[in-house]
């Protein structure tokens, strides 16, 4: 093999290596951009769902900016702490929106917002992210079914503990035909969120100055 051939082969190898590096870099950039877009879309969906849970006239602050840290995230089904959002009217907490998760969904974790009045009653529940089966488990979405409205007005005592289950398990809440796992997981997660609120009520409803110095 003469010198010219070796130089040509080396040049081609370098070019192939360069193209491979550029390709890997482009894939990484696209992936990073896609992940950022997904995260932003989830934040926007969370913000919309949060405001949907709060009745008009029930707050005069900016709940998205009024956050209280939460602790013991596993009690909310979370891997890491996420803040609670507090709605205030005339300086007093009127409601708390908890971020929770049902880790035992059929196709993975189901991300939830759980709205609770200062008196401990559910304003409502919204699903903000999930991977449940289209046409079956995805009926936990308000856009697909009114099922989630079944939580409205409920509390720890209404129904009693035994009622916090799907009807197939002897509880109060409907399940879906062919998809019991998904609603069962959501019911369990909402019940846990209410327990968390009850155990941490004083801190979650504290005046803004006190909450900010927790």
Swiss-Prot record:
EC number(s) from the headed UniProt entry: 7.-.-.-
Any one GO CC term of the record: plasma membrane
InterPro entries given in the database record: FMN-bd, Ion_transpt_RnfG/RsxG
Any GO BP: electron transport chain
Its membrane topology: Single-pass membrane protein
Domain of life: Bacteria
GO molecular function, one term: oxidoreductase activity, acting on NAD(P)H
First-listed, main subcellular location of the protein, grouped into a coarse class: membrane
Modified residues (FMN phosphoryl threonine): 180
Subcellular location per the Swiss-Prot or TrEMBL entry: Cell inner membrane
SMART domains, sorted: FMN_bind
Keywords: Cell inner membrane, Cell membrane, Electron transport, Flavoprotein, FMN, Membrane, Phosphoprotein, Translocase, Transmembrane, Transmembrane helix, Transport
The protein's required cofactors: FMN
Membrane-spanning segments: 13-33
Enzyme class: translocase
Pfam families, alphabetized: FMN_bind (PF04205)
Oligomeric and partner information: The complex is composed of six subunits: RnfA, RnfB, RnfC, RnfD, RnfE and RnfG.
Family label: Belongs to the RnfG family.
Role summary: Part of a membrane-bound complex that couples electron transfer with translocation of ions across the membrane.
Protein name: Ion-translocating oxidoreductase complex subunit G
């Amino acid at each position: 093999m003469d010198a010219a051939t070796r130089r040509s082969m080396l040049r081609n190898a370098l070019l192939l290596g360069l193209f491979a590096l550029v390709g890997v870099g482009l894939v990484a950039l696209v992936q990073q951009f896609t992940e950022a877009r997904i995260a932003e879309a989830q934040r926007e969906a969370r913000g919309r769902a949060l405001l949907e849970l709060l009745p008009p006239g029930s707050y005069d602050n900016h709940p998205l900016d009024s956050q209280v840290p939460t602790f013991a995230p596993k009690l909310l089904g979370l891997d890491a702490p996420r803040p609670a959002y507090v709605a205030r009217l005339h300086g007093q907490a009127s409601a708390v929106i908890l971020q929770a998760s049902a880790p035992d969904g059929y196709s993975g974790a189901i991300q939830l917002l759980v709205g609770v009045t200062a008196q401990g009653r559910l304003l409502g529940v919204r699903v903000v992210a999930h991977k449940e089966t289209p046409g079956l488990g995805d009926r936990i979405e308000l856009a697909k079914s009114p099922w989630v409205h079944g939580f409205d007005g409920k509390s720890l005592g209404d129904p009693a503990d035994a009622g916090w289950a799907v009807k197939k398990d002897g509880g109060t809440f409907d399940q879906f035909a062919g998809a019991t796992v998904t609603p069962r997981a959501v019911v369990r997660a909402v019940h846990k969120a209410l327990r968390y609120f009850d155990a941490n009520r004083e801190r979650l409803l504290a005046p803004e100055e006190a909450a900010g110095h927790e």
